[in-house]
Amino acid sequence: SRRILWNTLGEMDRAFGLDLEFRQNDLTVKLSNGSSIVLGGAQDRDEVDKWRGPKYSLAVIDEAQSMRTSILSTLIEDVLEPATLDLDGSIWMFGTPNASSSGFFYDADVFERSSWSRHNWTLLDNPHLPGAGAWLERRKEENGWDNETPIYRREYLGEWTRDEESMVYRFSADRNVVETELEEGFWD
């Protein structure tokens, strides 16, 4: 993500003459109005803690579906929410639905936490990909996918679709849950 964003910012600077100042040593881009864009990771608690301290008017988390719930919830609730408070800032999360349909990003999207605004789109909604429809039909045919195939629905339609086949430990409520009442004191 960092490399992609860094290169994209460089392309935008050249295309639009934004007069951005790139500081590669700390992955910071200075804007002419005095604002900064800081790129970095948050894969573990040490990296999350590096975001403590400054105030942010906007914090953006890309590929949020890939982050462990404990890390993402700590980053948002313990670090970024307090850091955006002073400037009445915002936190944006982006990502593609994951195969497990679980985690902080899933909960924020599906259960519509009151503080989160939801937005979604499909590959076909992108106006910069004029051949996307034909490409996607070829991809579906090459892979033997139909409109119900979980990877197709997640990656190209942006839908939360649990994919039991891609799980390390496949869980099925029919197979793994037993409906029975235990005798009182069973666990004693």
Where are these regions (language model features)?
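Inter-Walker segment of RecA-like/P-loop motor cores
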Residues: 2-57, 160
